[in-house]
């Protein structure tokens, strides 16, 4: 669960919310690393026209800039085989640039082969 992970990684995982009259309108869970802030989960309410998620992300980007790079995460689906053009367009509205990334599938029984490479 995310609560358990956040408890183990204090100051590295945090939640920001945008509220209107004490009602949560948008939220984002950030994973904070030495050089990068990564938006792991973000969501707005059903009324996307109010811009609450846009406002919230603008706030967190400005909060961590220029010390860290802000990562919106992937814009693809189905293990990178399909680009979500709407999501990419939305991210680019924040002047983000996109890049491709490889996807790998590794049997969990072979995890030990990666231990020294991921540190």
Positions of predicted regions on the chain:
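Solvent-exposed, flexible loop/coil residues
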Residues: 1, 41, 59, 94, ...
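A conserved beta-strand-loop-helix scaffold within acyl/acetyltransferase catalytic domains
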Residues: 1-48, 64
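Alpha-helical elements of Rossmann-like donor-binding domains used by nucleotide-donor carbohydrate transfer enzymes
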Residues: 4, 55-59, 86
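Residue-level detector of alpha-helical recognition elements and their boundaries
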Residues: 37, 54, 105-106
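Short, contiguous acidic/charged loop-to-helix segments that flank catalytic cores in large enzymes
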Residues: 43-50, 76-81
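Conserved acetyl-CoA-binding loop-helix of GNAT-fold acetyltransferases
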Residues: 48-62
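Active-site/acyl-donor-binding loops of N-acyltransferases
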Residues: 67-119
């Amino acid at each position: 669960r995310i609560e358990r992970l956040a408890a183990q990684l204090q100051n590295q995982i945090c939640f920001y919310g945008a509220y209107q009259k004490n009602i949560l309108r948008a939220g984002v869970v950030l994973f904070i690393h030495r050089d990068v802030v990564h938006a792991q989960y973000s969501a707005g309410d059903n009324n996307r026209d109010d811009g609450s998620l846009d406002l919230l992300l603008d706030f967190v980007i400005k909060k961590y800039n220029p010390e860290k790079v802000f990562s919106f995460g992937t814009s693809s689906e189905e293990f990178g085989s399909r680009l979500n053009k709407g999501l990419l367009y939305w991210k680019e509205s924040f002047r983000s640039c996109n890049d491709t990334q490889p996807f790998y599938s590794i049997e969990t029984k072979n995890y030990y082969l990666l231990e020294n490479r991921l540190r």
